[in-house]
Curated annotation (Swiss-Prot):
GO terms for biological process: Gram-negative-bacterium-type cell outer membrane assembly; lipopolysaccharide transport. PANTHER family: LPS-ASSEMBLY PROTEIN, LPS-ASSEMBLY PROTEIN LPTD. Its main location: membrane. GO terms for cellular component: cell outer membrane; transporter complex. Disulfide bonds: none annotated. InterPro entries: LipoPS_assembly_LptD (IPR020889), LptD (IPR050218), LptD_C (IPR007543), OstA-like_N (IPR005653). It holds the Pfam family LptD. Keywords: Cell outer membrane, Membrane, Signal. This is LPS-assembly protein LptD.
Length: 797
């Protein structure tokens, strides 16, 4: 108490001096009577500076501008109030008694970070209580309070404000309250209060509660009898609700999810609940009622330590009514599990587990909302242990599958890897470089329904070793890289057809030469300076033919020919076939690089392979060829700026004068991602031709339309559509889309279209009500998620 009175005595001296002092508020409205705290700092668009306009969205009518305030030459406003004396000025100073002091007329006071403006301030020296009448403004960095009367106890720090309004500048949040009180700086109580992020001229939505408790120490708030109002019309009521007031996680209900069921024309509705179990692990339970199916429950759990991250997702429905109708022999019980774990054992060692399983092949299409499992015929599950460091690499890989489609014959199902051990080593012995890659794999699969007479039951081990020796030679104008690689493989097989070897060895040497030159020049185009390069390249590879027909196919396929295959040593992917090669690739690339930024604006590449011998090694008939030349392979990439991306790649058969394969994509967005345009065309001769168009376009500052059309030109049918509308206000946003998509994406000819409607109602600074909109739109439209990220970072959505 004595220390407090000592600060008071010092404060009185500042007050007396302040009666004739000079103050600066930086606001021409300081002497007017605002109706609320928000109106005091509100500025319409036409009165903003160009700098202030940079953070204002086009549809917003204005924003809040926090003025400069404080006495000239006063202590920093970041000071702690308890350590600062009270400075004040007013028109008059009255001391009616020794225990009282009254400041009247244009009272301005400052203590540390707090700045006060009022009509009258009265200080009781005995009780250390300050009464304020006509409080025009109580400011702290990023915060503004306004009210009728206020009382503050200098000893206990108790504070109360009646007929109050508040403004939080950074969050664009404002509200009113009958009374605001605080027992200390960490606990604030608001009685009959409201909250909104809408501007003070348009109260589109708000939250009202009989009591709101804000616990800054715990980082959470609690509201009693809370009502969400749209245009002053109550639309949702919660008798009690807890919510976070900072970035710390808190348990509680999340905002509802609303969508359509893919059964009939019904809706789906759910209210997730978040469990903040500990600082390093949490869980989310999401019950979702789906019309025509029933109650789907999804549970997501996360666990994080310094070295480990684990995530588990589980979906379960006790009885799917629609599924039971379509599959009378099934119980209707459906489920799915997705588990991932990453463990950084040390700086060099890491373990990764990925386990997925579903009850049936249609689960992911019918029910999946949160599981991160790809819609595939064979669902992978794996465990990896890897080491990387000092030029060495090691990986232990165990991989299995769940074949979700029972119609797939057993011989077409993949082998399990139990395990696959890989080792790599690289070392430079100037001027040569030595490399070694080695891999051991045991392949196994269930052979119960396989035909032993056709060698379908074969399982066994494969050990492949590939040492290499490279002599890299380079200058500023080119390079020459001869390379020798030996590919040796041993097999120990089981359950082979009688007469076929169970022990097989294969050794194939590879000789390759990679050479290129670099020419460049400076040129000017359309007023910009570019550095153009011309890069011819030669690649030769030779490997002799070796009969491999007795070797089973565990994991091997023929790589799809494209531009990227021009400079590869082998045409096979996997270890059961090693190709015979005697071929030369000739290619050339030209680049245009912006001299000011170094960015690549244009790249054009083309090349062709010349075969000097027929390709005799194959998988059945795949991989065999008697052609002397490959099609021309090329690609063109044009990025004139950061907003436009154009790419063409394809294969051209010059002898037949036809395109074998082609793909064209164009993507455009404006600087603020308000306009999006995506075009693509895919073509494979006598097999596939599809076009895909998606667009998002602002009709007005507030309204945007979006759509997509996916069309199959071979089957002359639409295989996907999306149409929607988005309304943006400064404090809320509504999005709705209707989409159709193939039930079986692999069957573009016969698969039926499924339909769905997705919507989201977003309240700025509060949350979303609706479906998992971003997940849907990420698949439908390129750059849509980048648009959402841009809005969140720039406009704090």
């Amino acid at each position: 108490m004595k220390e407090g009175r000592k600060r008071l005595r010092a404060g009185y001296c500042y007050m007396l001096a302040g009666v004739v002092g000079v103050a600066s508020t930086g606001s021409s409205r300081a002497d007017s009577e605002p109706q609320s705290a928000a109106m005091l700092d509100w500025r319409m668009r036409e009165f903003l500076t160009p700098q202030q306009m940079t953070t204002l969205e086009p549809q917003c009518r204005g924003t809040y501008v926090e003025p400069e305030y404080g006495f000239v030459n006063a202590p920093s406003t970041t000071s702690t109030p308890d350590n600062e004396a009270l400075r004040a000025r007013s028109d008059t100073l009255v001391s009616p008694s020794e225990s009282a002091m009254r400041l009247q007329g244009n009272v301005k006071a400052q203590q540390g970070a707090w700045w006060l403006e009022a009509d009258q301030v009265e200080l009781d020296r005995q009780t250390n209580v300050v009464d304020l009448q006509g409080l025009k403004a109580a400011r702290a960095p990023g915060l503004l309070l306004h009210g009728d009367t206020a009382r503050y106890n200098l000893d206990t720090k108790d504070f109360s404000l009646s007929d109050a309004s508040y403004l939080i500048h950074q969050r664009h949040a404002r509200g009113d309250a009958e009374r605001i009180s605080s027992a200390d700086a960490q606990l604030v109580r608001i009685e009959d209060g409201s909250y909104t992020t809408c501007d003070p001229t348009h109260n589109d939505w708000s939250i009202a509660a009989s009591e709101i408790i804000l616990d800054r120490e715990q980082g959470e708030g609690a509201a009693k009898h809370m009502t969400l109002r749209i245009k002053d019309v109550p639309v949702m009521y919660f008798p009690y609700l807890r919510f976070p007031i900072d970035d710390r996680r808190k348990s509680g209900f999340l905002y509802p999810t609303i969508g359509t069921s893919n059964t009939g024309r019904g809706m789906s509705f759910g209210i997730p609940y978040y469990f903040n179990l500990a600082p390093n692990y949490d869980a989310t339970y999401s019950p979702l009622y789906m019309h025509g199916r029933g109650l789907l429950s999804e549970l997501e759990g996360r666990w994080l330590t310094e070295d480990t991250y684990s995530e588990v997702r589980l979906g379960y429905i006790a009885h799917d009514s629609e599924f039971s109708k379509e599959n009378p022999d099934e119980s209707g019980r459906r489920w799915a599990l997705d588990f991932t774990n990453r463990y950084d054992v040390s700086e060099n060692w890491r373990s990764t587990i990925d386990y997925n399983v579903v009850s049936d092949k249609d689960y992911l299409n019918d029910l999946n909302r949160t599981l991160e499992i790809q819609q595939e015929t064979h669902i992978k599950r794996s465990w990896d242990v890897a080491y990387l460091g000092g030029g060495f690499s090691f990986k232990s890989h165990v991989q299995g599958y769940q074949t979700v489609d029972d119609d797939i014959v057993d011989n077409d199902r993949p082998y399990m890897l139990l395990p696959q051990l890989s080792f790599g080593w690289e070392r430079d012995f100037d001027p040569v470089a030595f490399g070694l890659e080695s891999e051991f794999t045991y392949f196994w699969r269930d052979d119960e329904n396989l035909d032993p007479a056709r060698d379908q039951q074969v399982v066994g081990a494969r050990w492949r070793t590939q040492p290499s020796l490279t002599l890299p030679l380079s200058t500023t104008w080119g390079y020459l890289t001869p390379k020798l690689r030996l590919d040796h493989t041993d097999y120990q097989l089981e359950q082979r057809v009688t007469g076929l070897d169970e022990s097989i060895s294969r050794t194939v040497p590879f000789y390759s030469l990679d050479a290129g030159m670099y020419f460049d020049r400076t040129l000017s185009l359309f007023g910009d300076e570019y550095n153009q390069s011309l890069e011819p390249r030669l690649f030769y590879v030779y490997s002799p033919e070796q009969d491999q027909d007795d070797i089973p196919d565990f994991d091997t396929s023929v790589a799809t020919f494209s531009y990227s295959q021009l400079y590869k040593e082998d045409r096979f992917v996997g270890g059961d076939r090693v190709g015979d090669n005697n071929r030369l690739t000739l290619g050339v690339t030209s680049r245009f690089n912006d001299r000011a930024t170094g960015a690549e604006r244009l790249r054009a590449s083309v090349g062709q392979i010349f075969y000097y011998e027929d390709q005799q090694v194959g998988l059945g008939t795949e991989g065999l060829s008697d052609e002397s030349e490959s099609p021309w392979a090329g690609e063109l990439v044009w990025r004139p700026n950061d907003r436009f991306d154009f790419k063409v790649e394809g294969l051209w058969d010059w002898q037949e004068r036809q395109t074998e394969k082609g793909a064209t994509t164009l993507a455009f967005h404006d600087p603020e991602y308000r306009k999006l345009l995506n075009l693509s065309h895919r073509y494979t001769h006598n097999d596939l031709e599809q076009t895909d168009v998606s667009v998002l376009f602002p009709v007005t500052d507030s309204v945007s339309v979006l759509g997509r059309w996916f069309f199959d030109l071979v089957n002359h049918r639409t295989i996907g559509t999306m149409a929607g509308v988005e309304y943006n206000d400064c404090c809320w946003r509504f999005q709705v889309i209707a989409r159709s998509f193939l039930k079986d994406a692999d069957d573009t000819e016969n698969s039926e279209l499924d339909h769905g409607v997705f919507l989201r109602f977003q309240l700025r600074g509060l949350g979303n009500i609706g479906s998992r909109f971003e997940d849907v739109m990420a698949k439908e439209m390129r750059n849509f998620n980048e648009r959402e990220t841009y809005r969140a970072e720039r406009y704090q959505w």
